[in-house]
Regions:
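Short, basic/hydrophobic alpha-helical segments
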Residues: 1-15
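Acidic, metal-coordinating catalytic cores used for nucleic-acid/nucleotide bond scission
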Residues: 17-26
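A short alpha->loop->secondary-structure connector
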Residues: 32-38, 54-59, 112-121
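Short alpha-helix plus adjacent loop in nuclease-associated cores
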Residues: 39-80, 85, 127, 132-135
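Extended, highly charged alpha-helical segments
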Residues: 64-108, 114
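Glycine-rich, often acidic, oxyanion-interacting loops/wings at catalytic, nucleic-acid
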Residues: 92-172
Length: 172
């Protein structure tokens, strides 16, 4: 793209735009490195006609973005640097792992309730302490299949706890 522009339009100022989405900001960064002005816009901020809304296709979207860029109707969003994006990824990953851990704990509690296994009085308020997990590990179901299922949930929980601890250390 850059060589085509420089070959066919030497000395021109190049401007580009794209809608923010799943692909992140790496395209923005690369275009800027090559000397092409680039803005990233919120898709909801792009002026759209009813006809364009009903015929949502790439060629229609491209023309709409080009027309809006040329007329100065677009305002770019803030594009964070790569380091900030990676920090955000770390925080999002931790949040995702905490949600998985919560789901895993709920599955274990559900399994205990399903089989009528009640917590001992001394562990009711222990909130997933080591002692509570040791108690869970000592539970024996009537069949090997039940033991395997419970053990799988407990192993997943321990694995998630290790991951979250490592993420917490990385964040601090």
């Amino acid at each position: 793209l850059v060589s085509y522009l420089r070959r066919n339009f030497p000395g021109a100022l190049y401007h580009s735009v794209y809608e923010a989405g799943f692909s992140g900001f790496w395209i923005h960064d690369q275009l800027r490195e090559k000397g092409i002005d680039c803005i990233v816009v919120n898709p909801a901020d792009v002026p759209t006609k009813d006809k364009e809304r009903t015929k949502k296709r790439d060629p229609v979207d491209c023309r709409k973005l080009a027309r809006s860029l040329r007329s100065g109707e677009l305002e770019g969003i803030y594009v964070p640097c790569r380091l900030k994006l990676e920090d955000r990824s770390l925080i999002r990953t931790r949040l995702s792992m905490v949600r998985k851990q919560t789901r895993c704990k709920n599955q274990i509690k559900g399994m205990l309730l399903f089989y009528g296994i009640h917590l001992p009085e001394e562990l009711i308020n222990s909130h997933w302490s080591r002692r509570f997990i040791r108690w869970l590990e000592r539970i024996r179901m009537e069949k090997a299949s039940g033991n395997i299922a419970l053990k799988a949930h407990l192993e997943e929980l321990k694995h998630l706890r290790k991951i979250i601890a490592a993420l917490n250390r990385a964040i601090l």
